[in-house]
Regions:
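Glycosyltransferase donor-sugar binding loop
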Residues: 173-187, 201-204
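A short, active-site helix/loop in glycosyltransferases that binds the activated sugar's phosphate group
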Residues: 97-131
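A charged, aromatic-enriched C-terminal amphipathic alpha-helix characteristic of glycosyltransferases
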Residues: 16, 280-313
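Conserved acidic donor-binding segment of nucleotide-sugar-dependent glycosyltransferases
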Residues: 257-269, 277-283
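A conserved mid-protein helix/loop that constitutes part of the nucleotide-sugar donor-binding site
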Residues: 19, 151-165, 184-187, 269
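Conserved donor-binding/catalytic core segment of Leloir-type glycosyltransferases
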Residues: 135-164, 174-177
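Short hydrophobic beta-strand element within catalytic cores of glycosyltransferases
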Residues: 242-245
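Aromatic "clamp/platform" in nucleotide-sugar-dependent glycosyltransferases that forms part
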Residues: 225
Length: 316
């Protein structure tokens, strides 16, 4: 089977969509398929089109369907699709209607899909290979890692704000990895570095180096306002690094309702209290670590591979 995988993200940009597309291309090859990854549908022959992003890939989805109405078309919904665009954007809504199958990346996203379309929707959790790295407390630092480009949906400076005025005995330090995609947020981040000795923004790292840095941290902090799912969350769970996360559907669909590390979106004081609790209360930190470790099975690559195998087999 020849698969064309369309992702609207520039292939040189190291973001979630790019990471997802590269991982899926590897999965399809393991399943014995031939795959090409492009930003747009280019009209070249393929047996199935898989498009990431209902709105941003809408032109590719429409063109493929017009040219090949009998061929399978799989549309993968992102966070902005699920929690914004499919409610109001006609192009996104049309993408859902004409797709042979829809894919969402965590179970709570199903609630947002129009009821008549849920029967053709599949949940496929994002996976990650485990990376083991030693965490050294020799320097006394409690290392909190934030991974996310500087753009509004990520609320990327929330962790920095939460550690501004911690008690002097706290050893929390926040390390932030990500590109500046918003000039205003870039300016704010640079100001934050000058005023906040607990915050470091180190900019872009390769995906491999980012994963190593994440695996060495004591805690991963995910502050997003909107997510379809999160590669960073899957990578933290795979490496058994405990997480604190904003209470949003896109994260709750993987973490579950009983996860003890939630804070309300944008609530700096609640996040501050949660970070201090993780640092200063060993029992809470152990409970958080154990909860996240139990979820590591959910993000194992073999589960994602099998889910895609079952889906593609429907069109073989």
């Amino acid at each position: 089977m020849k698969i064309q995988l369309v992702t609207p993200a520039p292939l040189k940009l190291n973001n979630g969509n790019k990471i997802t597309a590269v991982r899926w291309a590897g999965i399809f090859k393991k399943l014995g398929q031939r795959v090409r990854v492009t930003q747009n549908y280019d009209g070249k022959p393929c047996d199935v089109l898989i498009a990431l992003h209902a709105r941003r890939s809408a032109d590719s989805i429409r063109r493929f369907h017009e040219l090949h109405p009998a061929l399978p078309l799989i549309v993968v919904l992102t966070g902005t699709d699920i929690y914004r665009d499919i409610r109001h954007d006609l192009n996104a809504q049309r993408s859902l209607e004409i797709a042979s199958r829809l894919v969402v990346l965590q179970k709570m996203a199903l609630r947002e899909i129009p009821k008549p379309l849920r029967r053709k929707t599949r949940v496929i959790y994002q996976s990650a290979e485990p990376i083991r790295a030693s965490r050294s407390r020799a320097n006394g630092i409690f290392d909190v890692c934030v991974v996310g480009h500087l753009r509004g949906e990520k609320d990327p400076l929330r962790a920095a704000m939460a550690v501004r005025d911690l008690p002097s005995q706290s050893r929390i330090q926040v390390t932030h990895i990500g590109l500046a995609l918003d000039p205003r947020l870039e300016k704010t981040a640079k100001q934050e570095i000058r005023r906040n000795p607990r915050y470091r923004w180190i900019g872009h790292l390769s995906h491999g180096k980012t994963r190593q840095r994440l695996a060495r941290s004591d805690l991963v902090c995910i502050t997003s306002k909107m997510e379809g799912s999160s590669n960073v969350l899957s990578e933290a769970l795979a490496s058994r690094v405990p997480v604190v996360a904003s209470r949003i559907s896109g994260l709750m669909g993987t973490l579950g309702n009983r996860f003890p590390g939630y804070f309300p979106v944008g609530d700096t004081e609640r996040l501050k209290a949660l970070l201090l609790k993780a640092e200063s209360q060993p029992k809470f930190y152990r409970d958080l670590t154990r909860y996240c470790a139990r979820l590591s099975d959910r993000v194992k690559p073999k589960r994602e591979i099998e889910a895609w195998r079952r889906l593609l087999a429907q069109f073989a």
